[in-house]
Amino acid sequence: MKVSVIGGGHGCYAAAVDLTEKGHEVTLWRRDKDLLKSLQDKKTISVLDARGEREVEPASITDDIEAAIKQASVIVIPLPATTHEALAVLTAKLWQDGQVVFLPPGTFGSYIFHKAARDAGNQADVTFAETGTLPYLARKRDTHLVAISGYATRLPTGMFPAKNTDYAFALLQQVYPSIEGIEDALSGALMNAGPIIHTPLILMNAGPLEHFEKWDIHNEGTQSSIRATTDALDAERIAIREAFGYAAPHFPLADHYDAERDEWMYGNVGHEKLHENRDWCEDISLTTHRYMLEDVELGLAFLSSCADYLQLDCPLTNGLLAIGSAINGRDFKQSGRTLHSLGLDQLDRDALKELLHEGL
């Protein structure tokens, strides 16, 4: 299948490599012309995983976004949610009937891309799919090398609009066999693991993160008090899902930490792979890193807004959001991605359900 991968980050390189090795005709698009030329000159991406190190050559590497979009049946956008608004405008007029666009994870970016297309006058029947995590535990070690320490085994995925679920699922499953269909894109957004795992890890490790040059939040930074906080925060996420009427499995993050529980998104050994790999011993800025700007400011703010919409009390969600706001000197409830900022908070439950199913 013709697949395009949009972006040049960790997950983008991993996707380009993985999907090429699965036999798809992959185009990798990235904006940075200098880094793009370096890749084009080399023609291959180096990958290091459990199978060893090797070179993989995507079919095409380009900075032509129109060409990348128009040639593909499936477009994968494994970029931080902080890129969504600008990218949605850039691509709004390019989508074509029958395409499936995969946002792993989405933070309800599916609606942002769909609305941008409609605002640009594009009425193409496109499906925007989103899931709860990247399909890869991956880190770029240099311009040409990506290390992949784990591959997702379960990707609960919702479609926008949900009326296209059967068609989109059948197409996307050819690219990612690990996807599992769920109710709709909002259900997919509420599977997002980033705000649950990263928010306590960075806020409760703020001291060592700012003191040491590098700190591993998944090893030394994961202690019993932080795990207890993560479980309590996840309980609020699951309560939000249940209040919206979404069914189990809710993929509780506790499954990620305990191989004896149900299989989580990265399988039963996902956390052990994080422990074994020191690629996550990083310099994490609490004002610029995506764990704050994507997972807290956008992702946790979105959860908070869903709780407000449902009139559901989520004190830990709001408390952690307030701490992130204090560190950064701005109110994440105002600056973040919320149902209010998306113009959806005035819809009643029936109207929201219809929007999720039918689109605009």
Q: What are the functions of these language-model segments?
A:
Residues 76, 81-144:
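Rossmann-like NAD(P)(H) cofactor-binding subdomain of soluble oxidoreductases
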Residues 23, 58-59, 72, 98:
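Short, well-ordered alpha-helix to beta-strand connector turns
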Residues 113-214:
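Rossmann-fold dinucleotide-binding core
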Residues 52-71:
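Short acidic low-complexity segments
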Residues 1-50, 67:
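NAD(P)+-binding Rossmann beta1-loop-alpha1 motif at the extreme N-terminus of oxidoreductases
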Residues 227-360:
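NAD(P)-dependent Rossmann-like dehydrogenase/reductase catalytic/cofactor-binding core
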Residues 179, 205-238:
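A conserved active-site cap/scaffold subdomain adjacent to cofactor or substrate pockets
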Residues 183-190, 208-222, 246-247, 252-257:
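An accessory alpha-helical subdomain
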